[in-house]
């Protein structure tokens, strides 16, 4: 039998993604990314929405929660932890790739230990967004309230390791900011809660809010921030159902709004780099790689990209995806999406493998 450890391939530029993923799938053990010399990242800390929520909504009175099966069926021991996924989410996977830990707990996890604080937590809340109205519509934790929890976190870390080490952790950790999808999909288009804004002015509100949030983080001593752009939100299963017509095509207006927001977010972060000494905000283009996975699923080892694995795959998400009313597809690994809104852990792994080296090196 051929030894996969010595397996190699020669790739043309046009096929580099397929080659990379072939190596990923053939390798059974995950090796942490090799950091540049002298680059130390002690913790991963996340803010934002359901993409990096690891359980903050569990004790919040909202319908935007998932601390029940079938969520978590591929998590450790098949436990539903409040992650909007069959398994782990990007915050977990990035922490693992960086050699920090395999699970990033929610800050409000009742089982949280002091040592967990030192290597990172998530403050993110599913359903939140840059628009202050977005979290209010579904009664979840706003970015402003997430920042208040972060203030508590800083004080706790200082009490554990002292002022100097606390400053080091805050300055050198990888901070993730992932939001915008719920603003576009829910607040602006589905609920029409901002009729006074056109798409251009609304995406400006979003990008301004993102810039202001990063500036506030800077005031606490944060220097390394990876800010994720909006995904092709019009192509997620639920938005195909709601806005893609009878054929459930991608909702082009949703995608155009996402691209417009991204086109404003990136230069905003470049501007902060010039005005805030020492900060390193990195724009993460998630739109293009996820869009390519959705449009060409077979290239990445998937079969289904227009429906989720839970229930019909067309609309079930959060409380609608439950073990009483929703069955689960026979093989989660064939699906790009777990429910009608969130990717599977396998999809997240593909995205992380494609993106991590591109931005980690920028923190040197």
From Swiss-Prot:
Q: Does the keyword Glycosyltransferase apply?
A: no
> EC number(s) of the enzyme?
3.1.1.-
Which Pfam families does this entry report, sorted A to Z? Lipase_GDSL
Source organism superkingdom: Eukaryota
Q: Kind of enzyme, top EC level? A: hydrolase
The residues responsible for catalysis, as annotated, are 50 (nucleophile), 339, 342
Which stretch is the leader sequence? 1-32
Q: What is this protein called?
A: GDSL esterase/lipase EXL3
Q: Which UniProt keywords apply?
A: Hydrolase, Lipid degradation, Lipid metabolism, Secreted, Signal
Q: Name one GO cellular component term.
A: extracellular region
Localization annotation: Secreted
Q: What is its main location?
A: secreted
Q: Does the keyword Lipid metabolism apply?
A: yes
